């Protein structure tokens, strides 16, 4: 296009020809300016002729060491996923309301990530744009997990019951409030770290290193998951560190406290390694932000870029653009105002509004993607919330607020559930290598549908296992103590098998979105943001409704799991009927919900 201009929009690539023209023009006008020569140098982090953040690849060792923080964050997330729903019930919060605490995840993900993304893009710290946020976020995670681990002791000091925790079965209100504060702070901190950590890797990796960088990042996440679930499954920490138990903090609490203190040590080491080896070049505020500075390592979604002639004020792809007119000869006359005419209202509020209003401008096929994605997460989130609780209650017949015998059975089930989640992570990691050939052979539409049908079968399997386990009650407590190895083994197998569809859920929908929106230019990045809405809104629905829904049918986790099975089946059917047939090409993507 002969008179196209580059404009400032969030997450965008500047047109190659425009940047080349800019460099040529500026060199002609100010060839003696050392400052420009420095900024136009191919080695500069922010400016390069090809529009990449880094024009020269960094070493593989640097890439590997620069994203170790992913393992530290994931370690804590694994403990959060496996231990915290059971633990909040030991503080007296009923099962019906235990799901409410998980509201913080989708809310902070929806609100915090746009703020952190924009602030890190504009950060002019001498330590770089991403590392300050990673450091602060990691510190917040450490504070949060310490608050959670010591919530019972803090509540005791603030006036909770002085009765020993082994005999007191009531609600410890102050401890529960402290726990919830720590839980929300933990989710906020997780979202503070994860976005800048991925953006840092995008900053450091060269154009031909994106797939490698993404694989390394996902590998560290898998390592963190495996270590975290292993820590949660041990159940022996309070025996190795008996001084962590107290009058307010019994065995389960001491185990949680020790595991989280280990998480603090591990996260600190990982963060320091990342901070040391990730060499960022400080950002100069008078330079426009590039797409790669903020792009997640999903795909080169903005490869087509935005092309606009001189625009009147208007809307395209759900984003409001202002008229951009300038004379090329005058553009470089005043370097101080070089980019003042490139304007975009990029506040966090504007980002959220754009995400909502852009629903009208998405390709028709994208609406089907959003429906399938929403149903997919309606099927997954009940499992994320209640997996180990289900193992402790339905499979092991335990009760977190019962007598010592039932509490021991419950704790044993929770540890077994954490072991199942460990196997789930292993299967997920192995399955991630199979997704690409499967998509090339069957197509992404069929693969996504297959994953949902697998979830349907597994969640239906939890119902069968629950009914089989409940039939053991008539055999008496001694039989329950010995346990039915068939049902317990089957439950662990279900946990492990769910790693296969989870790997697909973490990758294929984003590649489908990339292909469906491939012809919409800059709308692709916005479509990924809209896809996130199809994740967080179902999470909010499940967080608010799962506990009361279970209570409506007498308690337990079976009602929510049955509903999840129905949602998974519906997602599979709609995926086969409504999703478009896509090309067989597939680029693996990485994703995490936290």
UniProtKB/Swiss-Prot annotation:
Family indicated by similarity: Belongs to the glycoside-pentoside-hexuronide (GPH) cation symporter transporter (TC 2.A.2.4) family.
Sequence ranges on the Cytoplasmic membrane side: 2-58, 120-131, 196-214, 279-365, 439-445, 511-525, 577-594
One of the Pfam families matching this protein, by short name: MFS_1
Catalytic activity field: sucrose(out) + H(+)(out) = sucrose(in) + H(+)(in)
Gene that encodes it: SUC3
Broad class of where this protein is predominantly found: membrane
Induction pattern: By wounding.
Membrane topology: Multi-pass membrane protein
Name of the protein this chain belongs to: Sucrose transport protein SUC3
Comp. bias regions, Low complexity: 31-46
